[in-house]
UniProtKB/Swiss-Prot annotation:
Disulfide bonds: none annotated. Belongs to the class-II aminoacyl-tRNA synthetase family. ProS type 2 subfamily. It comes from the Bacteria. This is Proline--tRNA ligase.
Amino acid sequence: MRLSRYFLPVLKENPSEAQIVSHRFMLRAGMIKQQAAGIYSWLPLGFKALKRVEQIVHEEQIRAGHIPLLMPTLQPADLWRESGRYDDYGEEMLRITDRHKRDMLYGPTNEEMITDIFRSHVNSYKDLPLTLYHVQWKFRDEIRPRFGVMRGREFLMKDGYNFDLDFDSAIHAYNRHMVSYLRTYERMGLQAIPMRAASGPIGGDNTHEFLVLASTGESEVFYDAAITDLKFGDRVVDYDSREECEAIVKEWTTPYARTDETHDEAIFNAIPEERRRTSRGIEVGQIFYFGTKYSEPMGATVVTADGARVPVHMGSHGIGVSRLLGAIIEASHDDKGIIWPEGVTPFHVGIVNLKQGDSSTDLACEALYRDLSAKGLEPLYDDRDERAGAKFATMDLIGLPWRITVGPRGIAAGKVELTNRRTGESEEMSSGAAVDRLAQIYAGI
């Protein structure tokens, strides 16, 4: 993409309404525009980053054997009355009456609808286990939306639902989701810690939240520092193996890690003092096992091998896709702007032409643009007639992991400059070497 033809409405000044880093930089980098309290338009750069995050979520869900579908944003209220949650959910749920005086709602979550789909089409234990998921916009009418996409009213969320014959199978689904989430967050450059948490309005007997440590987090968290040394890495997981998934979950849940809602001071104080940590965390996902809480009242049952009809065991598993953009920026930035991890960057590399209109630099930049694209990379070429300082400031603000700088003196010597946004380190090399280096880096992501 050529910046002269792109829509990137960057701001030079910090917006007064932005209280935290991610909100400030997302507005300044032209990623989002507020349309109402807690409701945002996603501008091209933000939308591109959002789709990168969503793609990783899809890839890891499918890797774990989960099946995508798409449910509507509007739901009939009668489904929620069946489960008993329509009156319990509170004012966060946006209730709507259509022209035929039917009660509807803008879904804050989808347990009822997915249970209705299941009971309409699945009748036998032979069709289990089954996990369905979708990525869809949700709405919760927060009383005080703030912090940009971190606590908005409308948000993009992945929510998945497992249906299993018995407790043991449902716990395997729970473990499978935890493993899948650990891999998902690490691919995004995040260390998200699974912490035992409270179930809230969704309910259930077992739940973990995934939290990214950050001073701007809404939750107080208590944890054993040993958990921050754990890395998922590039291990290959057999998601069908109960033993393997259980072992990974045990590894990640043995060190103490809890939110303030489930914190146990006595257990925490038994940890050696040098490993006890208190911080704040941003919730980026949560998994639940809730047994037959929804299947029983809504009649989601299957016939077993001996002819008995039993309610299925269920769980739900959510990732805040749009919220992840804010969490990534909170965890990865400096005073100049965003620093995108390579796995989620909207563009792979920025090209800065120091002397637009100079035939040698123009030709070199065009060749770089063409060669990078041929390698499957997406460059953002700043071909604007702007001073070099303004171009560098824009690149630092939007935070692409790599920048190639092309100037007349370098071209005369057969060199370009490749700069790492995170470290600030620069290296001169030929254009071909820069292209090969970047292709190698991104091939491993």
